[in-house]
Amino acid sequence: MRQFKWIEWNLEKIDAHGLSADEVEAAFNRVFHIEERKDGSFQMFAQTPSGRRVWVIWRHDRVDDEIPDAFGDLIEAPVFVITAY
């Protein structure tokens, strides 16, 4: 299951564009287009449950102290949304 990491900073950014964390998270289930950017983040064009089409800029959260799991049981790094509009 996809996990998201939200902090006050990115919540304020999406709120300024009239979006909630729930809407942005749900948009990950309705993706029209996604591409990797030069900085390693992703730019995604998607749709919220209400039908609003949005751009979401995100990356996998950086976890420096994670030890590789020889059995492959590590959960994918959480999604850190940089902004959505």
Regions found by a protein language model. Give the residues of each.
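Ribonuclease/tRNase effector modules and their secretory precursors
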Residues: 1-85
